[in-house]
Amino acid sequence: LEEAAERGTVVQYLLSDAGQKAAWSTLSEMLNEGDMLYFSHGFGVTYKDQTGIIPPAHVDVALVAPKGSGTSVRRNFLDGSGINASYAVHQDFTGKADERTIALGIAIGAGYLFPTTFEKEVSSDLTGERGILIGALSGVMEAQYNVLRKNGHSPSEAFNETVEELTQSLIRLVAENGMDWMYANCSTTAQRGALDWHPKFRDAVTPVFEDLYESVTSGEEARITLEKNGDPNYRENLEEELSVMHNSEMWQAGAAVRSLRPENWKE
């Protein structure tokens, strides 16, 4: 860490948020005048009261935040397709921080770059992760699966109607054409039901999202993240939590369903 930071002119600080907090005292001493301190997330700087990450005045500070997982960023980079990303300049010491940041965004394969701030990036990112991208998505899936199972549907049927059809068919069409296209091109029965139930789901979960956003912007989610992820027993505790999901009937059914996809057939 020390050698890379001392020799580099663009220091990409890409440790986990808890890791950035732990290593900051070392890294901060290695930054040279005119360097760029580059983040892929606004967490450390935004929640400086909790992380202690306050960049020195003699460096540029910026971020490029890909809108996808690291796996997706790498996979898309290798196949030349790239992934959307936001960018922000928090501190422009050299007068060239904007140009340097955009160049870095292009270099990592971002096909579309849109401006933000460190604060807006972290509040939208944490809300999205805990919300529709992972937390809410898995929660809603689990709720529907459980209702179907409670009413006598088999694990395979419940999983296919809840997850497989969404991930293998519908979400791809939404990605290609938009949700409005999906509504216009599904069966009339699905169309009528979706139009009627969409506002009910929206109104039911809006208070949850409002609570979530407040928890993010107040710094409470940052506190929980740093506390949990900085625990010496973090890995063991995480494995225990993840094993509950992995061993659940729903996701065991999912493993069986995925194994039956044609691309997974063994010769």
Give the role of each language-model region.
Residues 2-3, 66, 117, 160:
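Proline- and acidic/polar-enriched loop/turn elements at helix boundaries
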Residues 3-6, 25, 29, 142, ...:
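A broad, structural surface signal
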Residues 38-130:
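Rossmann-fold dinucleotide-binding core
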Residues 1-2, 114, 157, 183:
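A generic structural-conservation signal
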Residues 150-267:
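NAD(P)-dependent Rossmann-like dehydrogenase/reductase catalytic/cofactor-binding core
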Residues 95-150, 156-174:
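Active-site-proximal catalytic alpha-helix in oxidoreductases
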Residues 15, 19, 93, 136, ...:
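Catalytic cores of large soluble enzymes that bind and process phosphate-bearing ligands
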Residues 1-53:
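Rossmann-fold NAD(P) dinucleotide-binding segment
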